UniProtKB/Swiss-Prot annotation:
Name by which UniProt lists this protein: 3-phosphoshikimate 1-carboxyvinyltransferase
Family: Belongs to the EPSP synthase family.
Source organism, top-level taxon: Bacteria
Pathway(s) this gene product operates in, as recorded in its UniProt entry: Metabolic intermediate biosynthesis; chorismate biosynthesis; chorismate from D-erythrose 4-phosphate and phosphoenolpyruvate: step 6/7
Gene name, Swiss-Prot/TrEMBL: aroA
Length: 429
């Protein structure tokens, strides 16, 4: 296991561009593969999760050419995928396995999906159950709750599904299945999750309708290849936003970040805490809003976080916890039970790590209470095999009284292979 240490910084200064958005990168491969004609993708995130998706489609007969800058996908059309000769390994990627489950349920062949030991613990019935209502034949451990999943493709029928959780993965799995289903497939949620799938479906020419409650996909219509430019991932930018806010004297410009409104909960939360983050040169790229983010160090204060903002910031909560621990006053996080079924239980993991660094934290069933003191101590902590836990604690080390060492950091390559190099570039020590 590789351990990394983060030492106190005097400031963060300069300009960076974070890698391409992980969610959009996944979807570009999936839709490009089942579209007719050629799709090009620039800005693709070459993290382990996205490579797992890429390898899955190559295993199903899709030709993907990579010159190091741009992917060229030779789409096979809705019914052109072929059966993989082996089990498809999704690694640590929940997005890969859940979205592929929806897509594979409608194919004319047999598929087995698995993943690493962390992914095999994560809940899958949330996609298996509604897909089964559509007519899918899916078998898995623990009555379909856990991977590996064995999927026998068969004709599907559209349904109206009211999801009990606001999950873009659940919604997107059903949308992908809905492309093949007889009739309309409608998905509603308690709070609207990120809408990258809806935007990209439109970009590829799918027939769908959206409203305030959800999305409806009409099956049986072919997609056409498109050119896609993937913006920088706001979930990756979040580590640098918080780092610059908590280290006095910092000023950092992050260029070309996706600012889709369903993903900008992190910006709203940091602004409510008193953080200075400006959106510059706002524009649209491949159907997605993009901006440059200028962040300056700020005195943060504790706030209450809950409700609709939670699904808009669900992946950023580990680093939000770091900001809260270094703020003045109490931060209450609620309505975030989904954090307990991520790559690890992120509520328990961040509570344990920040307590080890001297923070006062009380766990609740759906969140935590953080008593901000503006101070953390140097310590050695665990990543729990979770890339966002690892990076969040390395950010904490920039503003701690001593070095914070994180063990088992190979997981960072899941989403942000260049994280430490960018951190070294802008940290003034």
């Amino acid at each position: 296991m590789v351990s990394l240490s983060s030492h106190p910084a005097r400031a963060l200064r300069g300009e960076i561009a974070v890698p391409g958005d992980k969610s959009i990168s996944h979807r570009s491969i999936m839709l490009g593969s089942i579209a007719r004609g050629v799709t090009t993708v620039s800005g693709f995130l070459r993290g382990e999760d996205n490579i797992a998706t890429l390898d899955a489609f190559r295993a199903m007969g899709v030709q993907v050419h990579d010159d190091g800058e741009t992917l060229r996908i030779e789409g096979k059309g809705l019914h052109g995928l072929t059966e993989a000769e082996d089990v498809i390994d999704c690694g640590n990627s929940g997005t890969s396995i859940r979205l592929l489950t929806g897509l594979m349920a409608a194919q004319r062949f047999y598929t087995v999906l698995t993943g690493d030991r962390y992914l095999r613990r994560r809940p899958m019935r949330r996609v298996v159950e509604p897909l089964s209502r559509m007519g899918a034949c899916i078998h898995g451990r623990d009555n379909g709750e856990k991977a590996p999943l064995a999927i026998v493709g068969r004709p599907l029928t559209g349904i109206a599904y009211d999801s009990p959780v606001a999950s873009a993965q659940v919604k997107s799995a059903l949308m992908l299945a809905g492309l093949y289903a007889d009739g309309a497939t409608r998905v509603t949620e308690p709070h609207l999750s990120r809408d990258h799938s809806e935007r990209m479906f439109r970009h590829f020419g799918a027939r769908l309708e959206t409203d305030a409650a959800g999305v409806t996909v009409y099956g049986g219509h072919e997609l056409d290849g498109r050119d896609i430019v993937v913006p920088g991932d706001i979930s990756s930018a979040a580590f640098f936003l918080v780092a610059a806010l908590i280290v006095p004297g910092s000023e950092l410009l992050i260029r070309g970040v996706g600012v889709n409104p369903t993903r900008t909960g992190i910006l709203d939360i940091l602004a409510a805490m008193g953080g200075s983050v400006e959106l510059l040169d706002q524009r649209e790229v491949s159907g997605e809003p993009v901006a440059d983010l200028l962040v300056r160090s700020s005195a943060l204060k504790g706030i209450e976080i809950g409700g609709d903002v939670v699904p808009r910031a669900i992946d950023e909560f580990p680093v939000i916890c770091v900001a809260a621990a270094l703020a003045e006053g109490t931060t209450v996080i609620r309505d975030a039970r989904e954090l307990r079924v991520k790559e690890t239980d992120r509520i328990a993991a961040m509570a344990a790590n920040l307590r080890a660094a001297g923070a006062t934290i009380t766990e609740t069933a759906d969140g935590m209470i953080i008593e901000g003191t503006g101070r953390l101590n140097g310590v050695t902590v665990e990543s729990f095999g979770d890339h966002r836990i690892a990076m969040s604690m390395l950010v904490a080390g920039l503003a701690a009284s001593g070095a914070i060492t994180v063990s088992d950091t190979e997981c960072i390559a899941t989403s942000f292979p260049t994280f430490t190099a960018l951190l070294d570039k802008v940290a003034v020590r």
